[in-house]
Amino acid sequence: MKSGFVSIIGRTNAGKSTLINSLLEEKIALVSHKQNATRRKIKAIVMHEKNQIIFIDTPGLHESGATLNQLLVQSAIKSIGDCDVILFVASVFDSTKDYENFLSLNPQVPHIIALNKVDLTDNATLLKKLSEYAKFSQHFKAIIPYSSKKKSYKKGLLDEIVKYLDEHEYFYDPEFLSASSEKELYRDFILESIYENLSDELPYSSEVLINRTKDTPNLLILEANIITDTNSHKGMLIGKEGATLKRIGKDARFKISKLAQKKVLLKLFVTVKKNWQKDEEFLKKLLNDEN
């Protein structure tokens, strides 16, 4: 029996959250084409044979001067030292530059490269990319081609990860899908629904805070505040006669209901907090895993 923690590291939009969902065969990590959709570290528990792997989905690594993005990157870098194995996720279409930047952080724990999205390319392109990574072979333990859309890739990746975990009793109940709080997951589902319903920069000026939860045997009641930075953005979130907010609520309610396995009553409110993305105290509270 082995058990351990694996930090998933990589550039924004490398497919980290989609990879976690494919390993779980459940939707639990926020997925969006928008940069840095993942704002908090999600811990997802995958049982593989008799072994327990706890994946930590971190914010994407990238360069930015914005306060929020700096804190996201700090969170990702910190997780490098708080795990047993690092899984570096890279798209087969990306250059090795991001991996070289990762190596410059001097990771002290073993790492594996998951070369993602291989279902979207041909063998010649895959082999070329593998040869590009080969010059770094003294640094990584293995490089594994992966596709989140095909279950056949799952076992090979998990087998490789388990090799580098220590013998240890389970850290969590094997029946759990995630060590992250349900409140945190519900919050991310609402945020994802904002991403899906509003384009361009508006979602980046928005955040979600859960104000109240009440869980009964047949009904989950949630009240949440969508925080945004201007009155004009508030108007866009609400939409004409509340249509946009209703659509966001409907989409989020469906996702939460699927996870909670019960009917959900979701009440959404929109609040303006100017310059919240530059308020370090507010952001640190927001990004705190225990919040």
UniProtKB/Swiss-Prot annotation:
Membrane topology: Peripheral membrane protein
Molecular functions (GO terms): GTP binding; GTPase activity; ribosomal small subunit binding; small ribosomal subunit rRNA binding
Domain Era-type G: 2-167
Ranges where the KH type-2 domain occurs: 186-274
Keywords on record: Cell inner membrane, Cell membrane, Cytoplasm, GTP-binding, Membrane, Nucleotide-binding, Ribosome biogenesis, RNA-binding, rRNA-binding
Organism domain of life: Bacteria
G3 as annotated region, ranges: 57-60
Keyword RNA-binding: yes
Region of interest (G2), ranges: 36-40
Residues covered by region (G5): 146-148
Subunit annotation: Monomer.
Protein family according to the UniProt entry: Belongs to the TRAFAC class TrmE-Era-EngA-EngB-Septin-like GTPase superfamily. Era GTPase family.
Record-given protein name: GTPase Era
Species of the source: Campylobacter jejuni subsp. jejuni serotype O:23/36 (strain 81-176)
Lineage: Bacteria, Pseudomonadati, Campylobacterota, Epsilonproteobacteria, Campylobacterales
